[in-house]
Amino acid sequence: MQFDLTIPATTPTRHNRRNALRKLVAGVSFGLGLGFAMVPAAHATPAAPVNGAEYRTLDKAQSTDAGKKIEVTEFFWYSCPHCHAFDPALVNWVKKQGENISFKRVPVAFRESFQPQQRLYYALEAMGKLDDMQTKVFHAIHVERKSLDTEAAIADFVATQGIDRKKFVDVYNSFGVQSKLKRAAQLQEAYKIDGVPLVAIDGRYVTSPSIVGATLGSQPEAVLQTSTLQVMDWLMAKATKERKTASTGAPAASQIAAASKK
């Protein structure tokens, strides 16, 4: 199923831009869930998720740089209301994992117009301001209704947060940040991201509130978030077990099943 992510051409007023953005957000945020709506999942539950229902396995596992830890990656977009809503629950979940995981975020860009917010994220990261600013950026966009979609608007905003405007702009336009944008695009393609928020675990498994929602049906967003975290817990246990099996040299269940079919 294809989704039209093109913002309609309209008179360039703030009202029209916001209306167009809302339409785009709806398509981006729910793209994955709609894609899974026709998957049979009669026996799937968040506590016992099924591949192709509450989560999916990538055709090609991606390399991670987390060492012995399990890498957990959130793909997100600052202007996505579902990313904003999911963030507090995700942050709490990450804290509970302690040293078991290596957590990172990847800001996505489905269009060139998304790139200013990608640059915002990576500039804050480079300046060591991300932990303090992540929630503030979400709040500015979704609560204060600020349009942080241009370099000027973003620079003005960070300046109000006590960050040196000139230094920020220099980092925002730096080669280092540009390199991060290229890497983000590669990851977005590798993980086949067509909706956010989405969480990848150990470079192999992905899930999201919209994927889980395609199985559970119409539920309050808080229920979908909680269910997604349950699936993530299950995937963490699965990845941990598979790593232990691999380290001992014992064949994984998938390998045994594949061998039995030959």
Feature-to-residue mapping (PLM):
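Second-shell loop/turn segments in exported
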Residues: 76-79, 106-110, 122-123, 139-145, ...
